[in-house]
């Protein structure tokens, strides 16, 4: 968001967690977070969610409608949880592209998938979600899991995803969202701002990255706002499903 107190030539600012920073600095700061946590990313996901993130991702796979021969783009694919399942679904005649802007996360994902024997129909691309380096009307399905909140210009990223989808193609956005009850919200806040940074300190020696995680979730658009953004970008039949009381939401939209 722009700061109206600054002159017309001043660089626009945006949020990095609860901080207000120049737009050009956000990508650098986000990159530093993920360079720091990449090696322990999977372990922390299991610890933070009690393993429930695997159920959230399984539901994403089920709702994707991906089948044999499809071409899938997994944006912010990180350590490859979704890519691994999509690779199995699309088979040898299909293709999965794991894209991530962060080189450290991309390396961890590539190494992990190769160790598990996932190859042949998977490729790895370092890419910015706002400027996807793929042709128009190219993919049957695009997913972004726990990545959109880190993007500086979310509206541009959503339009970029629309562009690379084929007509009738599906976008699925899996992201932390707004809990549906005030009681759950209070408990979630206590966990996020107290236990999460402590866990990050103990496991990765980096409390600040997990403090940013908690703050970035609160700054991310809520369920209805993100739905409206997808409609505004040009998606049809946009719906969302709350999971774990709205702590996580899965949005789905179709390209006309």
Swiss-Prot record:
Which reaction is this enzyme known to catalyze? a 2-demethylmenaquinol + S-adenosyl-L-methionine = a menaquinol + S-adenosyl-L-homocysteine + H(+); a 2-methoxy-6-(all-trans-polyprenyl)benzene-1,4-diol + S-adenosyl-L-methionine = a 5-methoxy-2-methyl-3-(all-trans-polyprenyl)benzene-1,4-diol + S-adenosyl-L-homocysteine + H(+)
- An example molecular function term from Gene Ontology annotations: 2-methoxy-6-polyprenyl-1,4-benzoquinol methyltransferase activity
Q: Which CDD domains match?
A: AdoMet_MTases (cd02440)
Give a Pfam family name: Ubie_methyltran
Q: What is its EC number?
A: 2.1.1.163, 2.1.1.201
Record key words, sorted: Menaquinone biosynthesis, Methyltransferase, S-adenosyl-L-methionine, Transferase, Ubiquinone biosynthesis
Annotated pathway: Quinol/quinone metabolism; menaquinone biosynthesis; menaquinol from 1,4-dihydroxy-2-naphthoate: step 2/2; Cofactor biosynthesis; ubiquinone biosynthesis
Superkingdom is Bacteria
Which annotated residues bind S-adenosyl-L-methionine?
A: 79, 100, 128-129
The protein's matches in InterPro entries, at most eight in alphabetical order, are given as: SAM-dependent_MTases_sf, UbiE/COQ5_MeTrFase, UbiE/COQ5_MeTrFase_CS
Sorted alphabetically, which NCBIfam families does this protein's record hold? MenG_MenH_UbiE, PRK00216.1-1, PRK00216.1-5
> What PANTHER family does the record point to?
2-METHOXY-6-POLYPRENYL-1,4-BENZOQUINOL METHYLASE, MITOCHONDRIAL, METHYLTRANSFERASE
Name under which the protein is recorded: Ubiquinone/menaquinone biosynthesis C-methyltransferase UbiE
Task: Say which species the protein is native to.
Answer: Pseudomonas paraeruginosa (strain DSM 24068 / PA7) (Pseudomonas aeruginosa (strain PA7))
């Amino acid at each position: 968001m722009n700061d109206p107190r600054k002159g017309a030539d001043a660089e626009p600012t945006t949020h990095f967690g609860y901080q207000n920073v120049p737009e050009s600095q956000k990508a650098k700061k986000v990159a530093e977070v993920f360079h720091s946590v990449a090696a322990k990313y999977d372990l922390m996901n299991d610890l933070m969610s009690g393993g429930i993130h695997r159920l959230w991702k399984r539901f994403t796979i089920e709702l994707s409608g991906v089948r044999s021969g499809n071409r899938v783009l997994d944006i912010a694919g990180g350590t490859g949880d979704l890519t691994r399942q999509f690779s199995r679904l699309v088979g040898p005649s299909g293709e999965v592209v794991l894209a991530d802007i962060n080189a450290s996360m991309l390396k961890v994902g590539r190494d992990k998938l190769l160790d598990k024997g996932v190859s042949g129909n998977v490729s790895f691309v370092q890419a910015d979600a706002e400027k996807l380096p793929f042709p128009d009307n190219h993919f049957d399905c695009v997913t972004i899991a726990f990545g959109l909140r880190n993007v500086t210009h979310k509206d541009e990223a959503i339009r970029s995803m629309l562009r690379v989808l084929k007509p009738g193609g599906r976008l699925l956005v899996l992201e932390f969202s707004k809990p549906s009850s005030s009681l759950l919200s209070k408990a979630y806040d206590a966990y996020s701002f107290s236990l999460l940074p402590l866990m990050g300190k103990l496991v990765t020696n980096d409390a600040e990255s997990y403090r940013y995680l908690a703050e970035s979730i609160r700054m991310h658009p809520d369920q209805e706002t993100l739905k409206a953004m997808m409609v505004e970008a040009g998606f049809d039949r946009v719906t969302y499903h709350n999971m774990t009381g709205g702590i996580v939401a899965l949005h789905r939209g179709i390209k006309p």
